Amino acid sequence: MKLWDKGYKIDDAIERFTVGKDKELDLLLATHDILGTMAHVTMLEHVGLLSKDDLDVLLPALRELYKEAEAGNFVIEEGIEDVHSQVELMLTRQLGEVGKKVHTGRSRNDQVLVDLKLFTRAEIEKTMGLVEQLFHTLQKRSEEGKSLLMPGYTHLQVAMPSSFGLWLGAYAEALTDDMRLLVAAFEQANLNPLGSAAGYGSSAPLNREMTTKLLGFADLDYNAIYAQMNRGRMERTVAFAYSSVAETIGRLAMDCCMFNSQNFGFIKLPDTMTTGSSIMPHKKNPDVFELIRAHANRICALPDSIRHITTNLPVGYFRDMQLIKEVYFPLFDQLNNLLEITTYAVENMEMKADIMSNPLYAPAFSVEEVNRRAANGVPFRDAYRQVADEITNGTFHHEATVEETLSHYTHEGSIGNLCNQQIKAKMDALVRSIPLEGIHQAINNLLNR
């Protein structure tokens, strides 16, 4: 069955090629397609295009299909093109002529669009929860490590004193910017395209505001052409937000690979979280961080993959956009898995103490010494040259306790004043900005009408 069936058989080779992986991927859209159909038929009854009797049999049937799909028992049968055709077929089998009415005033184009929006909205919500978990873990470890000094680097050269608190806190704050991008992506997904039909609207007296409220959307994609043009654009926006999270995770993983090596020795993974070598018995490799890095890099390439599918397409819908699903749908599980394993690894890694007692890192305190002399009246440039000469001839020494060192750094965002609570407040405000409660209530109301 095809929604566009005109009574003649399509060439088998053409059908295989054009359907591609759609049947497999469309299973992820099943619950969302059913929700969209429930909202659509409810609206059709409201505007007089469907009788109350028809609606009274359609909604219970759709609710049962929803339960089946939610339980993972929904199947797209052999010969059925996609999830949309399967839902209509099952309704028609069960309800007869009534099932054939659900597509009134709707195109497969806006049906796909609303499915994608609902799917994306739900997936971003899951990812946001996992970003929050990693954020809180990083902040917790940052607090635990705020008195554990380590060298900071520029150009991979020892630069100034840092701390585990400052290092891990940096990645926590990076996640607040990533969350801001996720919020923007969520807001783009939270706009209703239903009613735009094939991109030019419908002569049926549709009530698009009603379906917007029924599905918990914040607003409409108003212009019918733009609703179709937004296909690919939304996915690219989401992919960019996800690639930003992936970049943060990937950089953290690279740091951990480096800091775990014998040449640094700042952190240590439990033996149970490392792998070995078939020839070198001493090896305890941080494969978990290496694979996090590789997976993150792959996600970072995704926005370009999507852009290259949609670039220079003229106005209107084109089948090219079907290919976006193949790279877009796996994205969510890929990043979610990375977030979970990164959180687990950060929770369990050991932070080493007394790193800065190594004479190798003494020059990290040179700026502090320059500032001390400048505060005592030596012109800054002269103090700089004095300390530089002492480092060159090997006479530079700096002695201070951890507490004394931290006390010299009082400004916001320094090792002595991490501002973790202020960073947490930023994250909390971003999380609160998403109207999840209203969305959940709308979907619950729709399922229980």
Where are these regions (language model features)?
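Short, well-ordered beta-strand elements within core beta-sheets of diverse protein domains
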Residues: T42-L50, L166, R236-S244, E369-N376
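Charged, flexible cofactor/metal-binding loops and thiol motifs
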Residues: L116-G129, E143, P151, Q157-N312, ...
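A helix-coil-helix interface module used to build multimeric assemblies
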Residues: M1-G201, L206-T212, T275-G276, L291, ...
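Glycine-rich cofactor/substrate-binding loops
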Residues: M1-G36, E97-V98, G265, M280-R449
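Short linear loop/turn motifs
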Residues: V57-P60, I225-N230, Q386-E390
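Generic, well-ordered alpha-helical scaffold segments in large soluble proteins
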Residues: H40, A61, L65-E68, M90, ...
